[in-house]
UniProtKB/Swiss-Prot annotation:
UniProt cross-references to PANTHER family, sorted A to Z: 7SK SNRNA METHYLPHOSPHATE CAPPING ENZYME, BICOID-INTERACTING PROTEIN RELATED
Similarity comment: family membership: Belongs to the methyltransferase superfamily.
Pfam families xref list: Bin3, Methyltransf_31
Sequence ranges of Basic and acidic residues compositional bias: 1-10
Keywords of the record: Acetylation, Isopeptide bond, Methylation, Methyltransferase, Nucleus, Phosphoprotein, S-adenosyl-L-methionine, Transferase, Ubl conjugation
Listed EC numbers: 2.1.1.-
PTM-bearing positions, type Phosphothreonine: T188, T268
Function: S-adenosyl-L-methionine-dependent methyltransferase that adds a methylphosphate cap at the 5'-end of 7SK snRNA (7SK RNA), leading to stabilize it. Also has a non-enzymatic function as part of the 7SK RNP complex: the 7SK RNP complex sequesters the positive transcription elongation factor b (P-TEFb) in a large inactive 7SK RNP complex preventing RNA polymerase II phosphorylation and subsequent transcriptional elongation. The 7SK RNP complex also promotes snRNA gene transcription by RNA polymerase II via interaction with the little elongation complex (LEC).
Region Disordered, annotated ranges: 1-141, 235-291, 309-383
Modified residues (N-acetylmethionine): M1
Modification after translation, per record: Dephosphorylated at Ser-126 by the PNUTS-PP1 complex, promoting RNA polymerase II transcription pause-release.
Name used for this protein in its record: 7SK snRNA methylphosphate capping enzyme
Catalyzed reactions per annotation: a 5'-end triphospho-guanosine-ribonucleotide-snRNA + S-adenosyl-L-methionine = a 5'-end methyltriphosphate-guanosine-ribonucleotide-snRNA + S-adenosyl-L-homocysteine
Amino acid sequence: MIEMAAEKEPFLVPAPPPPLKDESGGGGGPEVQSHQEAASGELRDGTEHGPGPRAHSAGAAASGGGGPQAQAHGEPHGRAAAPADVGEERRGGGGTDLGPPAPPRPRNGYQPHRPPGGGGGKRRNSCNVGGGSGGSFKHPAFKRRRRVNSDCDSVLPSNFLLGGNIFDPLNLNSLLDEEVSRALNAETPKSSPLPAKGRDPVEILIPKDITDPLSLNTCTDEAHVVLASPLKIGRKRHRHRGPHHQQQQQASGGNDSNAAVLPTDPLTPSLHGEGATQQQQNRGQNRDAPQPYELNTAINCRDEVVSPLPSALQGSSGSLSAPPAASVTSAPSTSSSSRHRKRRRTSSKSEAGARGGSQGSKEKGRGSGGGRHHHHPLPATGFKKQQLKFQYGNYCKYYGYRNPSCEDVRLRVLKPEWFQGRDVLDLGCNVGHLTLSIACKWGPARMVGLDIDPRLIHSARQNIRHYLSEELRLQAQTSEGDPGTEGEEGTITVRKRSCFPASLTASRGPIAAPQVPLDGADTSVFPNNVVFVTGNYVLDRDELVDAQRPEYDVVLCFSLTKWVHLNWGDEGLKRMFRRIYRHLRPGGILVLEPQPWSSYCKRKSLTETIYKNYFRIQLKPEQFSSYLTSPEVGFSSYELVATPNNTSRGFQRPVYLFHKARSPSH
């Protein structure tokens, strides 16, 4: 045995490394017994061991597993049994001790991943300290570990469209070299790809004035632009209307057809004879029924407060006339206009086809020229009764409804010397704010306000109390500071007005109406110098214009031309201009504020008459100045006064001044 061991000594398994420290504190690992190894050990050490010596494996000692012993007999070539897996030994697999195992050693900076089933870690996001003398951090078993060295590296881009590299993907460095830049930009689509072409056409807005592209210096409501590409017609959304709505619409259809026809009686009869009696009856009706345009609805102001009509106005029989009956009546009203933007519940599904057919004709008629004549069918949906109410532009506080608490900015462009001691006629005075302001501030000899709507005239007469109360309040403040009221002790005696709730005065108007002017009172002092009359200034025939006699020094025509133009067409507007010229005395002036043509289309669907006249208009507002100075009318000259800086751009309209010669030609 000794000889055999000596001969086979070079083939023995090398001795295991010295055992590591028992970090886990467990028992010994599995023991392996080998007779050949024991014999060779005796030759080296020279000591005698008993039969069956045991050799402890280094791996078992290091692991501390305390597993079962494995004995190998008759192993070929004297080799001992292979120890268990190194990973299993280090984890302490197969041992009976349940102590925490030692962490594995990192190899070349790589931490091997533990399978989720081994080791029995604690809950997530917790720090685990190994048992025994040496404490170490243990990563959670079921949490993915971040790799230090990734197995698969990310593929960096190598092909750049602009010819750059990873450090210069846009190839900006090529711009430093002019030759390279010129070569790259020789073919534009390659160096800078063109954007994808969209489905919708690009709308190019070309301004009318290239020096003012934003139309900041113009006074029109809308900038006149020309579209190089056609507009895209959007689809309108219509709410679903059930059968209940259709039944209700059919039930109310018969009543609306009869209620839409207005009476054909004259709006205002003549001022003498039977007309005076009829006018008194109308005044009584206005006192009884509440008026929607009244500023003070709780106080019934007597019409006798207003001074009587001047004799010059009573003497002229043809100064006031009624509008033609054809322009007052209109088509039956069944539903709202198709051009209205708001959703209305007064149109049923059966009208969808008619609405679509009329919309196309209206769009084509918007840009119709003056010299062309086309056939424009009427809207199939009809006109509403509410629209007939305001067909003459007789909105309450038409000019100042957007800024009711502010002063009329048109007063800033007017000059007081135009009105002092003059006879003034204000056409389309509405509720009379501008008329009363001029009569109160600048002292005209006579101020006549004329409007076609009797309800607006009724409100204008009631507004006299407000202006008179304001004047009385200012006079009271002035008298308080008068030095002539000093007493015996040298102190100023101030007579304070009785305290009264300001809210009642603001909501209910003045406490008392102004006094009725006595006989012989000065008629040139406010409020005796102002009077409001209901009537239509547009005459029926040209023969009546020739019979007009001069009566006034100043005629005001603010924001009126559009409504005369739409209701009576070119003939009615020309007739009104000629009558204004004949109504002025030699040396008189006309203050004109026309509306722009762009604002006409917004009101073309009010009535059937307006819709027809809109497409027949040939005399545009830009041609008013040339027409008024032509021999057909007779004004000698005109000038642009200014454009009031109104807060609303739609009311920023130019104000013109037309002069009548001292010796008129006719």
